[in-house]
Amino acid sequence: MSSAPNGRKKRPSRSTRSSIFQISKPPLQTGDWERRGSGSESAHKSQRALDDCKMLVQEFNTQVALYRELVISIGDVSVSCPSLREEMHKTRTKGCEMARQAHQKLAAISGPEDGEIHPEICRLYIQLQCCLEMYTTEMLKSICLLGSLQFHRKGKEPGGGSKSLDCKIEECAETPALEDSSPSPVDIQQHSWQVSTDIENTERDMREMKNLLSKLRETMPLPLKNQDDSSLLNLTPYPLVRRRKRRFFGLCCLVSS
């Protein structure tokens, strides 16, 4: 390094000083970028699948609540029976489809049966199980109520029919036409056939949901299978172990106005 005219050494320029202390980082290899990108993309897909499953279970929960409200309305004189049964059929069909989709999505994101389980997945399993149990219970209630209404409509005589057809015709002849509001025998027979069809369809859907509930219990991860009913509410971080009990706020079947 040359000396300055006054005897002092020249200081290195600013660019030279910065280059001296510059730390060079080795560039990432192509494989590192791919691994980092694939890991982030996989985590994003998993979270998106979890969110979709959570939304689907919540929608099924709401559908079960709506069906329950319809079941409670069976026998209400202010509700038209044909329109009520049609609405129940639509709601029940939509709920069964949601239940099947929720089970498929939940089974896809749960991972290995003996592996660690995320608390949110555990919660979704419990919510779906509770909703299915309530759903089948409400279907059984609707079958009992529809059958009871059908029985009372036919009459309470031991023979199953209230009055003979001749008696009905005589009563209709004695009553003025403008005041005759009683249904005809043909209407009664058609109504009875429709109610019987609704009962059969409800029984079919109830059996399907019971089978789905059995599949759900079979495909549950081992940490959930090994827990009893009281400890299922202790959704602790994975791996799932028994800790002190805490309250479970995942309520089922609430309809917000």
UniProtKB/Swiss-Prot annotation:
Palmitoylated. Undergoes rapid palmitoylation turnover. De novo and turnover palmitoylation are both mediated by ZDHHC2. Palmitoylation regulates the cell membrane and nuclear shuttling and the regulation of GPCR signaling. Upon depalmitoylation, it is targeted from the plasma membrane into the nucleus. GPCR signaling inhibits depalmitoylation and promotes localization to the plasma membrane. Its main location: nucleus. It is a lipid-anchor. GO terms for biological process: G protein-coupled receptor signaling pathway; negative regulation of signal transduction; regulation of postsynaptic membrane potential. Keywords: Cell membrane, Cytoplasm, Lipoprotein, Membrane, Nucleus, Palmitate, Signal transduction inhibitor. GO terms for cellular component: cytoplasm; glutamatergic synapse; neuron projection; nucleus; postsynapse; postsynaptic density membrane; presynaptic membrane. A lipid is attached at C252, C253 (S-palmitoyl cysteine). Residues 32-45 have a biased composition (Basic and acidic residues). Residues 1-45 are annotated as: Disordered. It is found in: Nucleus; Cytoplasm; Cell membrane. A motif (Nuclear localization signal) lies at residues 242-247. Interacts with 'R7' family proteins RGS6, RGS7, RGS9 and RGS11. Component of some R7-Gbeta5 complex composed of some R7 protein (RGS6, RGS7, RGS9 or RGS11), Gbeta5 (GNB5) and RGS7BP. Regulator of G protein-coupled receptor (GPCR) signaling. Regulatory subunit of the R7-Gbeta5 complexes that acts by controlling the subcellular location of the R7-Gbeta5 complexes. When palmitoylated, it targets the R7-Gbeta5 complexes to the plasma membrane, leading to inhibit G protein alpha subunits. When it is unpalmitoylated, the R7-Gbeta5 complexes undergo a nuclear/cytoplasmic shuttling. May also act by controlling the proteolytic stability of R7 proteins, probably by protecting them from degradation. The nuclear localization signal is both required for nuclear localization and palmitoylation. Belongs to the RGS7BP/RGS9BP family. This is Regulator of G-protein signaling 7-binding protein.
